[in-house]
Amino acid sequence: MDRKREPVRALELFCGIGGFAEAACEKADVVAAVDQSEIALSVYRLNRPSTPVKGFNLETVSPAVLADFNADMWWLSPPCQPYTVRGKCRDLEDSRASSLRRILSILPQVRPFSLGLENVEGFAASEARNLLVSVLKSCGYRIREISLCPTRFGVPNRRPRYYLFASLGELGEMDEAKISEYSMRDFLDGRPSPELALPPGIVERFGRGLPTLDPDDRNAYAACFASSYGKALMHSGSYLVHNGGLRRFSPDEILRFHGFPAAFKWPPKLGLRKRWHLAGNSLSVFVLRRALSILPHFK
């Protein structure tokens, strides 16, 4: 009889609302989830009350603190702004990259068995990526880098991302199976809130320049939803044709595109704009669940 493999002890750094934990499911025991955002941690606590959450600054974390978690795997979703055009592509000179630099300075002293990282595609050509790969190679890790988008797995949402997986053991092949052939309507709320509607004046003035979708178009793909969705009108995500006008996607709809479960909850007092920000800042559970199969623990 085959013995069931024990879940890997995972440390979720830059955890946000818990995308990694959702993707890893029963294959990982998240020993701690770390983030600076108390708002993100409040969402994490609500949905995973048994997971210890830690709100501290990774820029100044000590090797002993990370070592004490005794994690077999580290997962990282560090800030993406240093590697985006809107963030001025300042790379390692950006103060928001300091936390990643600190973790990489500690890595040779702690050496978890495996590590994974997700970021925007611009990270692939960054000095931060070069530093990451250099540190990993010097520590003896095997490395796999890949660019993935939800559309590759049948999800109608463009969100291309860079992924890196590293292990002191062997790396495997990714599960390439499509999730399903979804239509846009599969992700939409049954009764969307009226507050999602764009004012007629905004539609009249800017409507032609906005990425709009017909929910009945089976070939439609939603643009990447950014953390600024709901705040910035342009370059932050798509809009739906609705009742003769346009409306925004709801935070719950964005989470469905990501692959979060229907049971996922928001704190009741958390406003719409904060929900948009956190949903846009999260990752594709659909994609990560398949990408994690590269690591030996997740086969």
Question: Where do the language-model regions lie?
Answer:
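Class I S-adenosyl-L-methionine
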Residues: V61-M73, C80-K231, L246-R247
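C-terminal target-recognition/interaction regions appended to catalytic cores
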Residues: P199-K299
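Conserved SAM/SAH-binding beta-strand->alpha-helix loop
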Residues: S37-E38
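S-adenosyl-L-methionine
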Residues: S42-D68
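Short beta-strand element of Class I
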Residues: V30-V34
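Class I SAM-dependent methyltransferase "Motif I" SAM/SAH-binding loop
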Residues: L13-C15
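Conserved beta-strand elements of the Class I
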Residues: R9-L11
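Conserved SAM-binding loop of SAM-dependent methyltransferases across substrates and taxa
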Residues: I17-A28
